[in-house]
């Protein structure tokens, strides 16, 4: 049976371990005369606007959707290299060796191979430096973008971020029918901080330029806190089509908060941005009973007690990471007071988007 995207996990390991393996892999590739490519693709953090990137809202509600998001320096690495034989070998949380593309269980990779016309004699490995399923960081889309980028390079094509993002949307939404939005693919492909607008005519990416000082402040004051719970976006978003008046009103409010978030970021008012995240979270919790639960509410209250002035759960909900804002000393308090399973990760911005870091 073909796996759904929600059930696919990328091999998760410490990034340092993977990077230490690269010289040996390249040496082997050179010795046997094979061609190796490595792509690096960031995941993302959405400040405001999540949910309005769904076609059911963006293409049907006046004004469309808008998201303020930033790519972060947590990556999906994809290696692509030739094989001696004509088989296809995949390595992620499991191993696959097949004779044809159609036999591949990993639906994202299967469709990426079809899209790029690569049909045999290839090996693909995906490695993530964070858990890659149900974290609310858009990791499935980062996988799709990263695999496409590496495969296009494999066939000698350098493609634009827009081409990668559109291709990933076609695979995940149009071909596989995943009930997800379109922000993750664009955030992963473009990198940096952006206002991403969604409407019936397409997607528009508008970079938000940050000064060096503002980048440093954001990286000091914002943290990610792992909930130790995961839930696939598809599971949360697989609900009846948008037609409930209250839900549409809430999504309009979330879209308006995205406009306000951009103003606060550009002005450098990060404390007010943290407060806005709290307001966004309260609105988002009313979208579906699957967005939050008692454990998540308890953890969020604990984060506020420890000094956070606001935050929100990332992604569709149900688990993953909280994005939290507080003073410069908040992170150390979180590390000291939270249990080990609630890992605290500094926010570090990626400015490059999906890129090829090795080709030989």
Question: Which residues does each predicted region cover?
Answer:
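Short, Lys/Arg-enriched N-terminal segments with co-localized hydrophobic residues
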Residues: 21-35
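DPxDG-like acidic metal-binding loop motif
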Residues: 137-157, 161, 189
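Intrinsically disordered, low-complexity segments enriched in serine/proline and basic residues
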Residues: 5-10
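Glycine- and acidic-rich phosphate- and metal-coordinating loops
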Residues: 115-135, 167-170
